[in-house]
Amino acid sequence: MTNRKEKSVLERLIDVNPEAEIWWDSSPIIYNDWVQEVLKELSGEEKEIVQRQLKRYYSPENSQNMLFKGVTTNPSLSMDVFEIQKSYWENFVDGLIDKNPEIDKEGLFWEAYKEIVKRGAQMYMPLFEKSNYKNGYISAQVDPRCMDDKKKMLQQAEELVKLSPNVMIKIPGTKQGYEVIKILTSKGIATNNTLSFVLPQFMVCANAVKEGLEIAKKNKVDLSKWRSVITDMMARYGDMGDLQGKGREIGIELSEADVRWAEIAIIKKAHQILKEQKHPSKMLACSMRVSPPLDDKKVAVWHLEKIAGGNFVYTCPPKFIKALILDCDDLEFSNQIDEEIPKKVLVKLLKVPYFTQAYLEDGLIADEFIYHPAVVATAKEFSNRTFGMINFVSTRLEKKKSN
C-alpha cells in the first residue's frame, strides 16, 4: 500500500488557479526518455500511479486535457537532446553535412538547432490547433551570444518563426532585446522575454509589448497566433547574482529563506502590476528550487507555494519535476499570491542595493540590464552550453573531412 497521491504535485498546484499553466522546460523530443528515467526509480503501485501522472502530463492523443500547455527551450537545453540521443543526432548531423558540403560549424549548429525546435513544435501542434492557438507554443531562443545585436536577433527570429506556426521567439532582457520584442509584437509574432530577473526589465518588456501591439492593431496585423510571456528566472536572481554576497558586502547576513523571499517578492510585485495595469503579457516563473530547508525537515518549494493562486506560467525542467515526484509528494497548496512578504524580511532586503534595484520599477535603466550580475552569469552559462552544441557538430564535421 502506497501513500502516494493520485494527483501529482503540479496538478494540485493548478487546482488552486486553473488559469495558471504548466510548461515543459526542455525539448519535447526527450520527454519519453525522461519518463523512463523517472520510472526506474519507482516500483509497484507507486510506479503505476506516477506512470498515469506522466501520461497526463503529455498525451498527444488527448492534447486538450494534458497538463503541459507549452514548452520553453533554448540552445542550452537543446544540448540535452544531443547528449541523450547521441547516436541518432550524430547520424542526423552527418546527413546535414552530406547535403551541405560547404557548411561551417556555426551554420551546422544553427540548422541542427532549428530541426530540434521544429520537431518539438510538431509534437505540440495538436494542442495549439485544438486550443484555438491559446496553448501549445514552444519557445525557441535566439543565440544567447548575440544578446546585444538587434539585427542578428531579428534575423534569427524571422528564421525560427518560419519553422512552425506555434513557435514563440525567446528574446533576452537587454535594451536591444526589448527593441526586438516591440518589433516582433508589431508583426504579430509571439514572444517570451528571457534572461530577465528584475522588475525594471519586466516593466520595460510589458511596455514594449504594449507599444508593439498598438502598431499591430493600427496596421490590422493578424494577432490570432500571438502571445506574450515575461520570464522571471527566480532562483538565478538570488543564486547566480549572489544576493547573499551582496548583503555581506554591506554587513547584512541573508539566509537561504531570505533569498527565496526576495525572489518571491519580485515576482509577486510584477504579477500585481501587470494585473492592475491590464497588460496582456503573462508572467512566467522558471528556475525554481526545492528550497528553503525548514527546521522540521519538511520539504519546501516556496517558489511554487508562496505564489500559488497567481495567473502564472510555471515552466519546469525535467530535474525539478523529478524532484517534485520523488521528494515532494506531500506538498499542498493554498492561494497565497496576495499574501505579503514578512515585513521584517522586506525591511532587511531593502537595505541591500542589489535587491532595491530589482524591486523598484525604476531601479535600473535599460542600458544597465546587460551588466546585471544574474544576466552576465546566466548568459555565460547559456553561451558555454551553446558552444557544447557547436563542438558536437564540429566533431562530426572534422570526422567527415578526414574520411
For the regions a protein language model found, what residue spans apply to each?
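N- or domain-start disorder-to-order transition segments that initiate the globular core
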Residues: 1-53
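Generic structural signal for well-ordered alpha-helices
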Residues: 10, 113-125, 154-158, 181, ...
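Hydrophobic faces of well-ordered beta-strands that scaffold small-molecule active sites
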Residues: 20-26, 45-52, 69-73, 136-142, ...
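An N-terminal structural lobe/cap that precedes and organizes the functional/catalytic core
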Residues: 37-45, 54-87
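Active-site beta->alpha loop and helix N-cap motifs at the rims of alpha/beta catalytic domains
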Residues: 65-68, 75-176, 180
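Active-site-adjacent beta->alpha loops and helix N-cap segments on the catalytic face
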Residues: 147-153, 171-185, 198-209, 325-326
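Catalytic alpha/beta core domains of metabolic enzymes, predominantly
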Residues: 190-336
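C-terminal extensions of enzymes
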Residues: 329-403
